[in-house]
Amino acid sequence: GLIVLNEMGLDPGIDHMSAMRILDRIRANGGTMEAFESYCGGLVAPESDDNLWGYKFSWNPRNVILAGAGSSAKYIDGGITKYIPYHKLFQRTVQVSVPGFDAFDGYANRDSLKYRSHYGIDGIPTLKRGTLRKGGFSIAWDTFVQLGCTDDSFIMELGADATWSDYLNAFLPPS
């Protein structure tokens, strides 16, 4: 026989397969769900964490930069639907502890509610999917968002000899 598999990256992909496996096990053991929160992220192995961001591009760099842009994050918390617009996304983070590691920044990942029926948890009062990044990432990234550095609605014409300083200065107000 021939097995055909499509690309099964992290998000969406492995995160959903892991979620379904856990939910199926809970149901098989007679359990019920009162809340569902799931975080994932392309985290750097400690021995390879050699930059201040604690991040390495493991997928399309443009998509990394635009992650979260385009629509508000949406989830439900205690029966109340929450919305986070992109310009606030990296300001509304939670700390997620993982044993053996420093705390991670967790932020809401797009529309969590569309997974309620897929996961079979339509009546659940809390459902949130999120992304993990190294602690401090969100504060730094939010600076770029607030400056407008992640806006792809225009083309910058700085020239081939432009420096990173020239790039950032282009977003700052006149002095």
Language-model features and meaning:
Residues G1-V44:
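A contiguous active-site-proximal alpha/beta segment in oxidoreductase catalytic domains
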